[in-house]
């Protein structure tokens, strides 16, 4: 399977003022693109049984870059311009679940932001569905580790490349801002698929 950098479904400046054009361009064109290229290169080397190059274990590097690519591909779909679907939680199954589990969107944001801001170093904040009881849960993963115990509904990149140029080291400001461009339509589609096994 080829690793392909996904096109963004919006312009680089479409998430302003919450995420700057500069961040989006660098994050997508450089960081996300590099993950794809590295994963592809490692895959080619491993196909030819070159597992270690210059002291680096390419099988591990392949896994790390592939996981980063998967997380970022989900992240890009997670976002939408505030002038469109961004930040708009409409009535429906996801809103009902958020109300039932967290007592409303504001409470979800507060709990999610507190949990995610607590990550030491780089990682991801997640809202996911527990497959055993179909309930929403908040979780975090370090580095580019995937969300294994939950089905991802919303993922937020908390690596510095996602926010530092605009928010410096104030993670809380970035986390508060990103909710204005969360694509809740996509989140609801994922939620319905995770809980009912059907697609909207």
From Swiss-Prot:
Print the keywords alphabetically: Antioxidant, Manganese, Metal-binding, Mitochondrion, Oxidoreductase, Transit peptide
Q: A Gene Ontology CC term for this entry?
A: mitochondrial matrix
The protein's required cofactor(s) are namely:
Mn(2+)
Q: What is its main location?
A: mitochondrion
| Keyword Ligase annotated | no
Instruction: Name the residues that bind Mn(2+).
Output: 27, 72, 157, 161
UniProt-annotated location(s): Mitochondrion matrix
Catalyzed reaction equations: 2 superoxide + 2 H(+) = H2O2 + O2
Q: Which GO terms describe its molecular function?
A: manganese ion binding; superoxide dismutase activity
Please indicate if the UniProt record lists Manganese as a keyword.
yes
Family, similarity comment: Belongs to the iron/manganese superoxide dismutase family.
Q: What does this protein do?
A: Destroys superoxide anion radicals which are normally produced within the cells and which are toxic to biological systems.
Protein name per Swiss-Prot or TrEMBL? Superoxide dismutase [Mn], mitochondrial
Annotated organism of origin: Agaricus bisporus
Gene behind this protein: sod
